[in-house]
UniProtKB/Swiss-Prot annotation:
The chain crosses the membrane at residues 207-227, 258-278, 304-324, 358-378, 392-412, 431-451. NADP(+) binds at residues 37-40, 59-60, 92-99, 117, 150. The lineage of its organism: Eukaryota, Metazoa, Chordata, Craniata, Vertebrata. The keyword GTP-binding does not apply. GO terms for biological process: copper ion import; copper ion import across plasma membrane; endocytosis; Golgi to plasma membrane transport; iron ion import across cell outer membrane; iron ion import across plasma membrane; regulated exocytosis; response to hormone. GO terms for cellular component: cytosol; early endosome; endosome; endosome membrane; Golgi membrane; plasma membrane; trans-Golgi network transport vesicle. The modification Phosphoserine is found at residue 482. It holds the Pfam family F420_oxidored. It comes from the Eukaryota. It is found in: Cell membrane; Endosome membrane. InterPro entries: Fe3_Rdtase_TM_dom, NAD(P)-bd_dom_sf, P5C_Rdtase_cat_N, STEAP_metalloreductase. This is Metalloreductase STEAP2. Heme b binds at residues 315, 408.
Length: 489
């Protein structure tokens, strides 16, 4: 929500919100209280002073605490601090809330901003802010600023996330704290009533929630394909010819694993969308919820795509290092000696030359498109695009990237997919396995692009239902569907 500032006259120092509520006045005339003298309280005080506020600190030991604050800060006892301001940051832990119980008569009608966090997710039945509200029912409790670290407060919002989540049961208090966040150069996000406080308190405690599944999938795929390549390229020569190729493990085997994992993860990104489309076509509606596993899969597509990009970049780095290996130099010298010994003047192979040229070219194009997909997934970049632009890049160009990557693998395999010597231990080559999932995804996309299917899918996305068509044909009424059941693809 934007505020309207009276900047026409130097005497107009008040800020008015669109709903007519008086916002915070000029920062130089506002005193803000902070209860607590810890690291967060110190950083918050410095931030408030830089933005022109006068700060009063309430501490149990003001004489000792004053040594850690600037001299312009008024460090005093809790009781004295509470009488000097109407906006108070409660920068103490939950277990110390009761220390303010005897001073509750001084907190009547005042705004208490709870900035505390817990040690683990859902540690208590109710949020800290709701617990604070139960202790001081006559105060206006606001939850906010808990997602900002003390380090970010000191450095300023340019070096950290600028979003601050704020909620309160009192609209007027919430709007004042929102305006305060704007004055501190943060971006406030209004989450409504105090019932959202528990979700806000859980946000800083979550560790890559959406990344766990994709990372497990990536590690599992990497482990499987690494062992698969190890058995085929190291164990097989040793078992058959007593040839020791264990030197290939650090570079060559790893480099064979990386591209397979990259293209498989990229295929999983778009396979989820195909399954979702097939699900909607099967049931003839978009109002039926996806199964939990598919819903989770759809939410993790960004993480799968970024992991695919990571494996592709590492694959390029490994490939560039291949000629630098000592083993590669020895192999090159051996090939040169054998050519001289066989009296071969020209070893030019037109087919191999074209194959490698196209192979590298398609690889570069694939990496370029993956880089574009990765860059547009950055929030600041995606926010600058409208929905059609973002969808075109992530969907249309994404499928183009998958198609070019598939060509890259096909050209790498070339005729070797039909050569018997490449089926060691009766297992197909690595590149054959890498082509299975991308081929399924590309074939599935081609089926969805057929006019008879794409038209039906577009109608479903616009709200058409199979049951509605049947009911209309029979002259029946369509039952009302709650908007809560709507699942957008």
């Amino acid at each position: 929500m934007e505020s309207i500032s009276m900047m026409g006259s130097p005497k107009s120092l008040e800020t008015f919100l669109p709903n007519g509520i008086n916002g915070i006045k000029d920062a130089r005339q506002v005193t803000v209280g902070v209860i607590g003298s810890g690291d967060f309280a110190k950083s918050l005080t410095i931030r408030l002073i830089r933005c022109g506020y006068h700060v009063v600190i309430g501490s149990r030991n003001p004489k000792f605490a004053s040594e850690f604050f600037p001299h312009v800060v008024d460090v005093t006892h809790h009781e004295d601090a509470l009488t000097k301001t109407n906006i108070i940051f409660v920068a103490i832990h939950r277990e110390h809330y009761t220390s303010l119980w005897d001073l509750r008569h001084l907190l009547v009608g005042k705004i208490l901003i709870d900035v505390s966090n817990n040690m683990r997710v859902n540690q208590y039945p109710e949020s800290n802010a709701e617990y604070l509200a139960s202790l001081f029912p006559d105060s206006l409790i606001v939850k906010g600023f808990n997602v900002i670290s003390a380090w970010a407060l000191q450095l300023g919002p340019k070096d950290a996330s600028r979003q601050v989540y704020i909620c309160s049961n009192n609209i007027q208090a919430r709007q004042q704290v929102i305006e305060l966040a704007r004055q501190l150069n943060f971006i406030p996000v209004d989450l409504g009533s105090l019932s959202s406080a528990k979700e806000i308190e859980n946000l800083p405690l979550r560790l890559f929630t959406l990344w766990r599944g994709p990372v497990v999938v990536a590690i599992s795929l990497a482990t499987f394909f690494f062992l698969y390549s190890f058995v085929r390229d190291v164990i097989h020569p040793y078992a058959r010819n007593q040839q020791s190729d264990f030197y290939k493990i650090p570079i060559e085997i790893v480099n064979k694993t990386l591209p397979i994992v990259a293209i498989t993860l990229l295929s999983l990104v778009y396979l989820a969308g195909l399954l979702a489309a097939a699900y909607q076509l099967y049931y003839g509606t978009k109002y039926r919820r996806f199964p939990p596993w598919l819903d989770t899969w759809l939410q993790c597509r960004k993480q799968l795509g970024l992991l695919s990009f990571f494996f592709a970049v590492v694959h390029v780095a490994y490939s560039l290092c291949l000629p630098m290996r000592r083993s590669e130099r020895y192999l090159f010298l051996n090939m040169a000696y054998q050519q001289v010994h066989a009296n071969i003047e020209n070893a030019w192979n037109e087919e191999e030359v074209w194959r490698i040229e196209m192979y590298i070219s398609f690889g570069i194009m694939s990496l370029g498109l993956l880089s574009l997909l990765a860059v547009t997934s950055i929030p600041s970049v995606s926010n600058a695009l409208n929905w059609r632009e973002f969808s075109f890049i992530q969907s249309t160009l994404g499928y183009v990237a998958l198609l070019i990557t598939t060509f890259h693998v096909l050209i790498y395999g070339w005729k070797r997919a039909f050569a018997e010597e490449y089926y060691r231990f009766y297992t197909p080559p690595n590149f054959v396995l890498a082509l299975v999932l991308p081929s399924i995804v590309i074939l599935g996309k081609m089926i969805l692009l057929l006019p008879c299917i794409s038209r039906k899918l577009k109608r479903i996305k616009k709200g058409w239902e199979k049951s509605q068509f049947l009911d209309e044909g029979m002259g029946g009424a369509v039952p009302h569907l709650s908007p809560e059941r709507v699942t957008v693809m």
